[in-house]
Structures are given as C-alpha cells and as structure tokens.
Amino acid sequence: MPQIQPSEVQTFASIKVVGVGGAGGSAINRMKDAGLTGVQFIAMNTDAQALHNSKADIKIHLGRDATNGLGAGADPTVGEAAANESRDEIREALEGADMVFVTIGAGGGTGSGAGYVVAEVARELGILVVGVATRPFSFEGEKRRVNADWAISHLGREVDTLITIPNDRLLQTIDRRTPLLETFKIADDVLRQGVQGISELITEHGLINLDFADVKAIMSNAGSALMGIGRASGDDRAVQAAQQAIESPLIEVSIDGAKGVLFNVTGGYDMSMAEIQEAAEIITSAVSPNANIIFGATLKPEMEDELVITVIATGFDSDTFRQQEVSLTVGDDTKPAEAEVDDEMVKNIDLELDKEESAESFAAEPETNIWENPTVEADDDEDDTPAFLRRRKKNKE
C-alpha cells in the first residue's frame, strides 16, 4: 500500500487579515475576541498609540517619518504617503499568503489613503485580495463622503473582490435610541462578520467543507460584491435567516444579477442537513439559474438554537452599481478632501468622550446581532483619545 509522504499532503491556505486604520484595527480586535482562528491578523496604522492597543499578531507602524506616530489627521493623502513609505514592511508581512483581506473604514485618513496601497502590494505578490470597506454615515459630513468615494474607488482597482458596507443602512437595523458611539462600534463589527463569514468557510471544520480553490473560483477578479447577514432561532430558523440574508438592508441592489454566490450557514450541533437544504433553496432561487453557487456549513458548539447565514454575491455587470454612485466613478481621479479640524469639532468630540466615560457599560455579546438591537461593549480606555486631539494637546504643551 503506497504511503503518503508529508510533502504530498496539501497544507491549509494561508489567510491574512489586514486592518488598516482605526476601523480596520477595531475589526481585527473584534475578530480576535470572537475567536476567529486559522488566520493571521495584521494591524497597520499611522497612529502609534492605536497600534499599542491592538490585539493583532503583527503590527506595522506606517509612515514613521511622515506622521511621527500621531495619525493621518483624517487626510487620505497623508495615509497614502505613509503606506508608500512603509511599502517594504507591508510586502514582508504579506509574503506567503494565499488570500488577504484588506479591511478599512472609508472616509478617514489612514484607511482611506493606505488601504489601496496595501492591496496593490498584495496583488503584486500574486495573492487573492478581498477588500471590505464601510461607507461613512451621512451625518459624518460631505468631506468624509468625498474621501470615502476616493478610497473605495482606488481600493476597488486593486482587489479581486470589493465588499462595500453602507453604514447608513445599518440605521435601519438598530434601535433609534442606540448611542452614537455604540453605533460606530456596530459598524466596525459588520466588517468582522464579513471577513469571518468568508474565512471560516476555509478554516473551520463543518458539515459541508470548502477549500481555498472553491472560494477563489467565486472571488477571483469578481469586482464589486454585496454581503448580507441573517440570524434566526426557533422554528423555521433556516428559512428566516436565509430570507434575512438575501433581503438584508446591507444589500443595495437585488442579488438576482449575481454571477457568483458564496454563502455560509453556521450553527450548533443541532443544525440539520434538512435546514441547510432549506436555506440553500431560498438563496439559489433568488439568483440566476446560471450563477456559480458555492456554500458551506460550519459547526460551532456554542451556538444553540440559532443559525447565522452570511451571503456574498459577486460578478455583477459593471452598470449594476451605477445608480448607487453619488458623485464619483471608478475612473475618476478626484482628490480626497483635505481634513479640517476646528475648535467646534474638538469640543463636540470631547463632549462625546466625556459622555462615554460616565455612561454605564454595555454587556458584550459574543456575536453582535444587528437584527435585534445589538449591544456592544463600551470601551472606557483613556488611550482611545483620537490622534488629532493628542496632537492638539501636545502642541499646547
């Protein structure tokens, strides 16, 4: 009987998750807290203090000379310059990966400016690159919207698949009384859910296992993608979760135009094959009969009487998202807006930080559920003071 040598056994795909900037770094911390395994976490930031508090496996301080460790000041051009300054460090950290996620919160400085540079380096190394970006809330202002359009446009050019999460649509899923700071944390956690839903298809043992080649078939050179998340328990939980996922407020257009669909069903040991079939039938009936559909089922012992379904739809026609674009197309080289931090802005943020320090802590849930008025752990760490406030304080001293 022939013996299989160690060199003949296929190794697991190397997956690296890169959080660029504040929101990307927060998403990494949430993934670590949620127990996501089988991937390497890399935090990249211009803010040295944020990196100090990061739970990432590897931390890269972008642009030491360009920023002196005090952040990009909400200016994407500073983030871009910082990433180019640290290009060799980025390359070294990404080498050897089969798949890289680049997560950013578009609209600020570091994530907006540095995100596409990180993706560009990964593509140069021949790595499958998936971008996951959040669009800012409308109330964050016109400058952040312009910065976000610029960032998402540039990131989209450098990744195989780009998943864009519109934060405004999160407002349809949470209680109106949810505090502002908690709302931002919920937005960060959706980044986590997107990355985790895809990576666990490869890294976690399940009832139905997929390998890297399956995921690559859907996500390689796929362009813009949509993500939906559904969560349900009790009777008909599979049907309810599947319907929530494909009708998710996070999905800006109908998924019936998708040429590729990847979805993951996650549940406890009480999850049955019949439930997986029910979910699959609902999702497949919502897309074209010619779509390439790949799905998996992941087992998590801690999940009792609950199913979570993550759907990624890819391969849309180029004009599918045209009506969703506000003022910037992919080919537009419009420069991002330069940041202006005035005394009123500082006063308002100081007020919000004071409120956060005096507020009662929220109970943390292992999985944030954006469908049931989620609660997110409040962070009372004084080290979370924004970088531009630290610069302002330093200048006064």
Model regions and ranges:
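Tubulin/FtsZ superfamily GTPase core signature
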Residues: 1-397
